[in-house]
Amino acid sequence: MSQSTASLVPEGNQGSLQEDVSFDFNGVPGQALDAVRMRLAQLTHSLRRIRDEMSKAELPQWYTLQSQLNVTLSQLVSVTSTLQHFQETLDSTVVYPLPKFPTTSHESLVTTLLRKKNIPEVDEWMKYVRETSGVTTALLKDEEIEKLLQQDREITNWARTTFRNEYGKHDFKNEESLSEEHASLLVRDSKPSKPFNVDDVLKFTFTGEKPIITGSTSTSSSN
């Protein structure tokens, strides 16, 4: 009669047997994972900050949002470059849970980590990019696709450089303050804070002498 493995191990030693198992973490790409984690944490923080700013009843100044958006875009570029730098390492890494990992309570996390296909949102983005670009990847060679991508990178770099040069020629914050200062100097038609004095009105009606308005009070001009 065959016996189970558990029955061959004394009950007192079963727990120690599991604890004595040592795992080799030398193959874990710690540097790559930590670099990606830091970049993603920074990007998530910036996106959350933009979301909070846009959720306020009163929006901040436009140049504040633009500054935060520039920071977010630079962090997005940093994430992309980091993923490209460690692409070979991450593509060859196999993810699997350890025996002590709580797979029951974190089933969704395990499913996400072990997922082989793109999530539906990513597939929709990739489909949209293909349709927008008008390039049929199935009919092109890898060299031709790489050439098109290189042309796109060159155009992107040119646009980024041109925008940076033009942006440096203007001081938007000072222009905003100057425009507000000029607007405050404009003459506006407004009602006086206090009505005309009755005596001044009667005097103007009788003699035609126009009263002089100084601030919120009105006094009659003297001959």
Curated annotation (Swiss-Prot):
Which Pfam families does this UniProt record tie to the protein?
Med8 (PF10232)
The answer, when asked if Transcription regulation is one of the entry's keywords, is: yes
Q: Which Gene3D superfamilies match?
A: 1.20.58.1710, 6.10.250.2610
From the UniProt record, which GO molecular function terms apply? Answer: protein-macromolecule adaptor activity; RNA polymerase II cis-regulatory region sequence-specific DNA binding; TBP-class protein binding; transcription coregulator activity; transcription corepressor activity
Reading the lineage from the top rank, the first entry is Eukaryota
Tell me if Transcription regulation is a UniProt keyword of this record.
yes
Q: Mind telling me which residue stretches traverse the membrane in this protein? A: none
Q: Which GO terms describe its biological process?
A: negative regulation of transcription by RNA polymerase II; positive regulation of transcription by RNA polymerase II; positive regulation of transcription elongation by RNA polymerase II; positive regulation of transcription initiation by RNA polymerase II; regulation of transcription by RNA polymerase II; RNA polymerase II preinitiation complex assembly
| Localization of this protein | Nucleus
Coiled-coil spans in chain: 33-59
Q: Which UniProt keywords apply?
A: Activator, Coiled coil, DNA-binding, Nucleus, Transcription, Transcription regulation
Query: A Gene Ontology CC term for this entry?
Result: nucleus
Region annotated Interaction with TBP1, chain positions: 2-138
What more the UniProt record tells us is: Present with 937 molecules/cell in log phase SD medium.
Q: How does it assemble?
A: Component of the Mediator complex, which is composed of at least 21 subunits that form three structurally distinct submodules. The Mediator head module contains MED6, MED8, MED11, SRB4/MED17, SRB5/MED18, ROX3/MED19, SRB2/MED20 and SRB6/MED22, the middle module contains MED1, MED4, NUT1/MED5, MED7, CSE2/MED9, NUT2/MED10, SRB7/MED21 and SOH1/MED31, and the tail module contains MED2, PGD1/MED3, RGR1/MED14, GAL11/MED15 and SIN4/MED16. The head and the middle modules interact directly with RNA polymerase II, whereas the elongated tail module interacts with gene-specific regulatory proteins.
Family membership noted in the UniProt record: Belongs to the Mediator complex subunit 8 family.
Role noted for this protein: Component of the Mediator complex, a coactivator involved in the regulated transcription of nearly all RNA polymerase II-dependent genes. Mediator functions as a bridge to convey information from gene-specific regulatory proteins to the basal RNA polymerase II transcription machinery. The Mediator complex, having a compact conformation in its free form, is recruited to promoters by direct interactions with regulatory proteins and serves for the assembly of a functional preinitiation complex with RNA polymerase II and the general transcription factors.
Q: What is this protein called?
A: Mediator of RNA polymerase II transcription subunit 8
Q: Which organism is it from?
A: Saccharomyces cerevisiae (strain ATCC 204508 / S288c)
